[in-house]
Each structure stands twice: as C-alpha cells, then as structure tokens.
Amino acid sequence: MAMCARLCGVGQSGGCRRRQQRKGAGNDPELEDEEEEDEVRIEAGEAAVTPRRPHSLLLLPPEILVEIFSLLPGTELGGLAQVCSKFRQILTTDTIWKRRCRQEYGVCENLRKLEVTGVSCHDVYVKLLHQYRHILGLWQPDIGPYGGLLNVVVDGLFIIGWMYLPPHDPHVDEAMRMKPVFRIHLMERKDATVECMYGHKGPHNSQIQIVKKDEFSTKCLQTDYHRMSGGRQEEFRTWLREDLGRTLEDIFHEHMQELILMKFIYICQYDNCLTYRRIYHPPSHPEDLLNPGFFKGTYGSHGLEIVMLSFHGTIAKVTKITGDPNVPAGQQTVEVDLTRPVQLPDVEHLRNFDEMSRLILDVQAQIHREQRQTDNEEDDGRGAGPDKAEPAQQPAPLLRPPNEDANGADDDGDGGEQKPPNVQSFVLPAGVMARNEEYPRSCKMCFYGTGLIAGHGFSSPERTPGLFILFDEDRFGFIWLELKSFSLYSRMRDRFQQSEAPSLEAFEEMLQNMQSWTT
C-alpha cells in the first residue's frame, strides 16, 4: 500500500507535505482532487521529457488499473481507496469485487441475477462475505452430550449452516444427510439478513453473534415457527421420522425408547438457540495408516454417531463428534496402539470368542508388565540399561499396507478365494453383537486398542481392551471385548472447505478442549 501511494505521488513525499501546509486554508473537495492530480503530474515529471514508461499508476489506463486492483486481496482495497480520488472512483467498478468474491469465496453468480436483486458484488463482498468470514468452516454445537457437526459454507449468494446427520441406523455405508439450520443473505442493498431454518413454517428472523475467536452463537427470534399444530406429540413423531428414520411403532425396546425421548426433550429446550465452537479436519501425513477424517459408526442402542479419526505418531485416536448420555461428544472413544499389531488366527479359531479374547488380553498383560518394569526402574533410581531392558517396542514397520491398490485391497469375498498376502480373512466371534451384519469379511491389519465405556451421565468412565480392525481405506471396526460388541465405521465422503487447522498445535489444543466442552 505504501508503494502504491509513492507511485501515485501522494505518499510521504512532497505531495503530502504540500497538502499538510494547506490544511489551514479550508477543505474544498474539488480543489483537493485537482491538487492531487497536479501533485502526481509534477512528481511524474510532466514538464520534463516524456518518459519511456509511466512513473505513476495514475497515468495508466483505467482498464489496466481495474485489472491490477482486482488481483489484490479484498481486505487491502479499502485502504487503497483512501490513496486518491481516482483510485476511489475505480474501486467502484463491480468487476473488481466480482473477481474477489469468486477467488476468495468461490461465488460464481451471474451479474444479471445480482442486478435483479439490486445488490452489487461490492455489497456481497463487504456486507456478507467479509462480515461473516469468521463463521465459515466446521463447528460443533453445544447440545449437552449429543454434540453435532455443522458446516458453514458460501452457497451462491447465501451463507448457509448445514447440520450433518448420520444415515439411518444401521446403514453406516450410506451417505450423510444435511439439514439447514440458518442462512444469511442480502436484501435490496440492506444489511445482511440472518434467518433461522428450524421447523416447517419457512425461514424466519434470527441473530448471529460472534462471541469470541472460534466461537459464535445463534438466537431464533420467532420460536413460534418451530411449533406444530399437533403439539409436542406431533413434533416428536416428525423429529423421529426425519432425524432417526423411525416411527414409534418401530421401537420395541424400552431402554431405546427412553434414550430417544430423552434426546428429543434435550434438543427441544434449545429451540435452535445454540453456541458453536470451531473444530478442524485432522491433519494427514504420508505415513498414516489410512487417511484421517470423519467417519460414522454404530454404537448399539445409541444408533449411528459421527467420529473423527486422527493420528499422533504411533497412536491413532477416534474422537466423538456426536455423542450420547454415556460417552458424550468430544470424548476419545477409541485409542489404537499402532506398535501392537495382532495377527488373527484362521477363521475357525476366530469364531471362538475365547480365542480372540486371549489374543487381546495377552497384549494387555504384556503392556502391564512393561509398565511395571518401567515404574520399578524409576523407583530404584536407575535407568534401563541396554543389557537388562527388554527390546523397545517398535512401530509397525509399514503403517500403510504394502501393494495397496484399488483392486486387490478391498476383497470382501468368501474365504475360499485366494487373497493378497496383506489381506486376512475376518469374521466376528460368536456372541459378539453387531448392529450391521453386512461388515467386510476380510481385513488388512489389526491392532490392540482400548475403548471408553461409562455409565449414564458419563459416570465411572474407564478404558477397556479391544481390537481395532482395518478393513480398507474407508472402513474400520472395533471389537469391545468387555461389552461383546462390534462397531463398524465408514468414511464420510463429504468435502469440507476452510476446515484445516492453522497448525498441528492448534489441532491438538482443539482435541484437548473438546473433552471439557461436554463434561
């Protein structure tokens, strides 16, 4: 910006000094504009021999200036308009702001559509996109233990907050469902309008307040739009059908009825007046076992929940984005030790729950022995000498399975078919409960892990041993040994913009903070 000012002849040189000397003579706008032009011509050497190229941006044709200015970030254009009147005039060209809207926010709307609504690209950029840029990205709503996943995106001439809902239980491989909860747009050059999308009576007035960095809240101003003529009973049936894909007649288990009714009552008390906290897509590294990201998984009577898989050296963490009254959102539901691979027996032995249990408990016992040895050495005040200590556990030599390709890696056929060397046959042991029997019948790798279980209200939480099973790039599973239960996780295919963490430290801090949001 300082360079632009110097090129224009209105920087901290003779132009500015002369202008300061005239301050006592009054402020005539037309006279000031003429003086700006005179100063630029003087400093460009108008009386001298015509230079080979312009020494001032003001001598460039307007269309060239429009092209130059449209390449600058929109946040810099406000200061550029203060340099001189010619710049101020050129910056009223909507072409500049159309390019900024497209390049910075992906808005590709036709200008004719804008003209019909009486809104300029400058208005869209300044009053909508720039003003609400801080709420774009991924967020977790504060809904007690239930959490959620909100994605705020620019959609045409709107900013829309989409709530992601898992597919109906137990169809974990189906696509996510999306539900709009609010939208922001411009109406006839006025300020941006915020509307609540909750309920079945159409958009209605709402407010958005940016509480602090990485946190904002919404407040519906017309909650009567959320009510239905049939009262709470009709609202409950509608919510049950739309959000869970169920009817009252489908639910026979009394405990499940209680869980569903409890969730409905809890959600209704907020009336779409919620606080949201920013979350990030997990960072990826070439050595990761599979690409990190968001998955939906089966959690018994609690239905399908959204989780986030992330890698931290030789540890993989599965964190709940949505939760339940036992283990709330934000908690680390599964932790996998990638230095503890487990070789599965043949299918016949794998069907025996005791055999699989022995494999897992043997690894747990080894971990406890190593931990006791480390503790004893610390108590004795001596380090582990190289001749006395057991060999340190090394990470799995290759976290990504070898020769991984699109054809040979996802063999779900019968055990009679010949499988690539890195693929093992898999079947659930007898007695292990699964919400979805359509799980893969082959896997790539297995590791020892622990799962978090707790009583109602997150009481008496404890980590219990289990088996992490990598099926393919988009699916993994976990056997909860103590619960005799199996969870299947399938990758969310959705693409998320503006969701990357600014740094690895910021992501780690977010993970730590998430655990305190719901406890």
Curated annotation (Swiss-Prot):
Kindly tell me the pathway this chain contributes to.
Answer: Protein modification; protein ubiquitination
Cell compartment(s), UniProt:
Cytoplasm
Q: Specify the superkingdom.
A: Eukaryota
Q: Which GO terms describe its cellular component?
A: cytoplasm; SCF ubiquitin ligase complex
Q: What is its main location?
A: cytoplasm
Q: Name one GO biological process term.
A: DNA damage response
General function of this protein = Substrate-recognition component of the SCF(FBXO31) protein ligase complex, which specifically mediates the ubiquitination of proteins amidated at their C-terminus in response to oxidative stress, leading to their degradation by the proteasome. Fbxo31 specifically recognizes and binds C-terminal peptides bearing an amide: C-terminal amidation in response to oxidative stress takes place following protein fragmentation.
Record remark: domains: Zinc-binding is required for the structure of the protein and facilitate folding.
Its family?
Belongs to the FBXO31 family.
Q: Could you tell me what this protein is called?
A: F-box only protein 31-A
Q: Which organism is it from?
A: Xenopus laevis (African clawed frog)
